[in-house]
């Protein structure tokens, strides 16, 4: 491993970027009710789904043109500039250079956790979880965190960042077990639950007390759990900030002794200046902790932003080890090589028709699929519609009760539902095995959100596909995404399938009817499945 050092005042900051095995040569490169900060902008977004907007008010426009059999007009597909026509998969664009001169170095594929100074009980625990060898981010960060260094860890989604900070935290905690030893902040409830479960699994040989502090649950049991001095607290910033503001001194005083703090998905937590920014809540949480000079701060993310890099420039106490910056595949290889990226041109007025027929193609029918939307309203609408079209579907977005969100995610993981319709609350960090296809029903406005979305498939070296639906208003967004990931999308094709012909022949009338039923269910306040939501009255 090579390193490049630069002088920050009187201190040395080391940056290391590790090239993944099999890579090509390096290129130049406020409140607890709203814990799902990934979705805060849903209802005010300018990127409303054209399809839903054009159908939402039947007073303004007809939901769909219902045709008699045999009366089939030709649907004019969206005219998209030739720029987004099919390109060779090997046609690479020049990715942005975010590495700031970081050194790329190869790693030893035979490295073991024991070689990283991980204690035998942790090595055995990881082995029981079928985690035999460390990934690049784990090789880079674990030894340095064990040395007491603050750390910025950047690595693409699915690369094992949680283990990279959980293992050294647990090893250092076992040497001096007291509460509260570590605090982990993460943007969404689902991520918090996943991290909580990993801490419990890895620490199973020990008597670790971990507590989960997220919205959607009663605050009183959470306050009681905090007052009992758990060893590790995993929280969303909004709910923990609520406890700091409203709970008694007994609830929060133990936070003043925290030794280690982790900001997971740090780019999202530290983003400022946008509606729904979590930064104020994050700052309130950190204000109660010991000062940076007296604690170890760890930032992990798939996209290392300037706000994240700013940690290395913070004033530091004389004698404290310098910040360690480890970036593995964060930019040049942000998209896994095993991921096939494609686009599908669809007419704005018939997107649901195309989606229905696309899900039923011979190659897609056996796949486990995640469909991403920009708004919760769109996700709710598509869930109703696809269920009426007899797809096995469930949903994950911020407007669902917490218990239902956990149940829905469990159904999808257990393959009881083949399709998960989600907003960006599901885009970051969630480990959902065996997702074969990601569909961007709405094009994300931020290219980094695209990276997080498509990262739900092609995980751990598996193959995967991502298909983005493109309308006439989306071309510039596609260009921005291609520039960010350094690769052009191919046009979607499947041998023997003419999607437009199938839409015309098979889905116009059926989908039109089911769209009206779905909109009626939503207007009457019914849940997916037709039951009326508790407390909702039928609209007169």
UniProtKB/Swiss-Prot annotation:
<comment type="function">
    <text>ATP-binding RNA helicase involved in 40S ribosomal subunit biogenesis and is required for the normal formation of 18S rRNAs through pre-rRNA processing at A0, A1 and A2 sites. Required for vegetative growth.</text>
</comment>
<dbReference type="Pfam" id="PF00271">
    <property type="entry name" value="Helicase_C"/>
</dbReference>
<keyword id="KW-0694">RNA-binding</keyword>
<feature type="binding site">
    <location>
        <begin position="155"/>
        <end position="162"/>
    </location>
    <ligand>
        <name>ATP</name>
    </ligand>
</feature>
<feature type="domain" description="Helicase ATP-binding">
    <location>
        <begin position="142"/>
        <end position="322"/>
    </location>
</feature>
<dbReference type="GO" id="GO:0003723">
    <property type="term" value="F:RNA binding"/>
</dbReference>
<feature type="domain" description="Helicase C-terminal">
    <location>
        <begin position="354"/>
        <end position="505"/>
    </location>
</feature>
<dbReference type="GO" id="GO:0005524">
    <property type="term" value="F:ATP binding"/>
</dbReference>
<dbReference type="GO" id="GO:0016887">
    <property type="term" value="F:ATP hydrolysis activity"/>
</dbReference>
<feature type="short sequence motif" description="Q motif">
    <location>
        <begin position="111"/>
        <end position="139"/>
    </location>
</feature>
<feature type="compositionally biased region" description="Polar residues">
    <location>
        <begin position="1"/>
        <end position="15"/>
    </location>
</feature>
<keyword id="KW-0067">ATP-binding</keyword>
<protein>
    <recommendedName>
        <fullName>ATP-dependent RNA helicase dbp8</fullName>
        <ecNumber>3.6.4.13</ecNumber>
    </recommendedName>
</protein>
<feature type="region of interest" description="Disordered">
    <location>
        <begin position="1"/>
        <end position="65"/>
    </location>
</feature>
<keyword id="KW-0690">Ribosome biogenesis</keyword>
<dbReference type="InterPro" id="IPR027417">
    <property type="entry name" value="P-loop_NTPase"/>
</dbReference>
<dbReference type="InterPro" id="IPR050079">
    <property type="entry name" value="DEAD_box_RNA_helicase"/>
</dbReference>
<keyword id="KW-0378">Hydrolase</keyword>
<dbReference type="GO" id="GO:0005634">
    <property type="term" value="C:nucleus"/>
</dbReference>
<keyword id="KW-0698">rRNA processing</keyword>
<dbReference type="InterPro" id="IPR001650">
    <property type="entry name" value="Helicase_C-like"/>
</dbReference>
<dbReference type="GO" id="GO:0006364">
    <property type="term" value="P:rRNA processing"/>
</dbReference>
<dbReference type="InterPro" id="IPR011545">
    <property type="entry name" value="DEAD/DEAH_box_helicase_dom"/>
</dbReference>
<keyword id="KW-0539">Nucleus</keyword>
<feature type="short sequence motif" description="DEAD box">
    <location>
        <begin position="264"/>
        <end position="267"/>
    </location>
</feature>
<comment type="similarity">
    <text>Belongs to the DEAD box helicase family. DDX49/DBP8 subfamily.</text>
</comment>
<dbReference type="Pfam" id="PF00270">
    <property type="entry name" value="DEAD"/>
</dbReference>
<dbReference type="GO" id="GO:0003724">
    <property type="term" value="F:RNA helicase activity"/>
</dbReference>
<feature type="compositionally biased region" description="Low complexity">
    <location>
        <begin position="43"/>
        <end position="55"/>
    </location>
</feature>
<keyword id="KW-0347">Helicase</keyword>
<keyword id="KW-0547">Nucleotide-binding</keyword>
<dbReference type="GO" id="GO:0005730">
    <property type="term" value="C:nucleolus"/>
</dbReference>
<dbReference type="InterPro" id="IPR014014">
    <property type="entry name" value="RNA_helicase_DEAD_Q_motif"/>
</dbReference>
<dbReference type="InterPro" id="IPR014001">
    <property type="entry name" value="Helicase_ATP-bd"/>
</dbReference>
<feature type="compositionally biased region" description="Low complexity">
    <location>
        <begin position="23"/>
        <end position="32"/>
    </location>
</feature>
<dbReference type="InterPro" id="IPR000629">
    <property type="entry name" value="RNA-helicase_DEAD-box_CS"/>
</dbReference>
């Amino acid at each position: 491993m090579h390193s490049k050092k630069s002088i920050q005042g009187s201190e040395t900051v080391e940056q290391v970027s590790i090239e993944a095995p099999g890579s090509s040569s390096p290129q130049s490169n406020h409140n607890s009710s709203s814990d799902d900060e990934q979705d805060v902008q849903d209802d005010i977004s300018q990127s409303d789904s054209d399809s839903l907007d054009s159908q939402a008010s039947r007073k303004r426009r007809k939901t769909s043109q219902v045709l008699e059999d045999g009366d089939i007009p030709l649907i004019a597909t969206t005219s998209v500039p030739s720029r987004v026509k099919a390109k060779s998969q090997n046609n690479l664009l020049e990715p942005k250079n975010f590495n700031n001169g970081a050194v790329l170095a190869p790693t030893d594929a035979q490295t073991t956790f024991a070689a990283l100074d991980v204690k035998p009980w942790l090595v055995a625990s990881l082995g029981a979880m079928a985690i035999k060898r460390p990934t690049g981010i784990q090789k880079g960060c674990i030894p340095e965190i064990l040395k007491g260094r603050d750390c910025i860890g950047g690595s693409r989604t699915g690369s094992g960042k949680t283990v990279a900070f959980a293992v050294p935290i647990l090893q250092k905690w076992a040497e001096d077990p007291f509460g509260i030893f570590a605090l982990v902040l993460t943007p969404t409830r689902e991520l918090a639950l996943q991290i909580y479960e990993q801490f419990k699994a890895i620490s199973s040989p020990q008597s670790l007390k971990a507590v989960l502090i997220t919205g959607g649950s009663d605050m009183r049991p959470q306050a009681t759990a905090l007052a009992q001095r758990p060893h590790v607290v995993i929280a969303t910033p909004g709910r923990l900030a609520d406890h700091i503001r409203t709970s008694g001194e007994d609830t929060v005083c133990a936070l003043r002794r925290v030794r280690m703090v982790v900001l997971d998905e740090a780019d999202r937590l530290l983003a400022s200046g946008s509606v729904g920014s979590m930064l104020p809540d994050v700052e309130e949480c950190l204000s109660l902790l010991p000062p940076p000079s007296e604690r170890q701060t760890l930032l992990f993310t798939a996209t290392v932003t300037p706000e994240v890099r700013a940690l290395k420039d913070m004033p530091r106490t004389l004698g404290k080890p310098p910040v360690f910056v480890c970036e593995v595949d964060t930019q040049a290889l942000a998209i896994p090589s095993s991921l096939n990226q494609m686009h599908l041109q669809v007419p704005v007025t018939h997107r649901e028709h195309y989606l229905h027929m696309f899900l039923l193609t011979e190659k897609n029918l056996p796949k486990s699929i995640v469909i991403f939307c920009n708004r919760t309203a769109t996700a709710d609408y598509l869930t109703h519609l696809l269920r009426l079209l007899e797809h096995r579907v469930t949903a994950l977005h911020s407007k669902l009760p917490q218990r239902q969100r956990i149940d829905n995610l469990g159904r999808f993981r257990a393959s009881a539902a083949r399709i998960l319709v989600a907003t960006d609350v599901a885009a970051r960090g969630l480990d959902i095995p065996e997702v074969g296809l990601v569909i961007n029903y709405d094009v994300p406005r931020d290219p980094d959100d695209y990276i997080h979305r498509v990262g739900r498939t092609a995980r751990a070296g598996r193959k995967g596909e991502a298909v983005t639906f493109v309308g006439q208003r989306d071309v510039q967004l596609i260009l921005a995404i291609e520039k960010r990931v350094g690769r052009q999308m191919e046009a979607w094709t499947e041998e023997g399938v003419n999607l437009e012909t199938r839409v015309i022949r098979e889905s116009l009338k059926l989908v039109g009817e089911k769209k009206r039923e779905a909109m009626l269910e939503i207007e009457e306040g019914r849940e997916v499945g037709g039951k009326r939501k508790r407390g909702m009255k039928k609209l007169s």
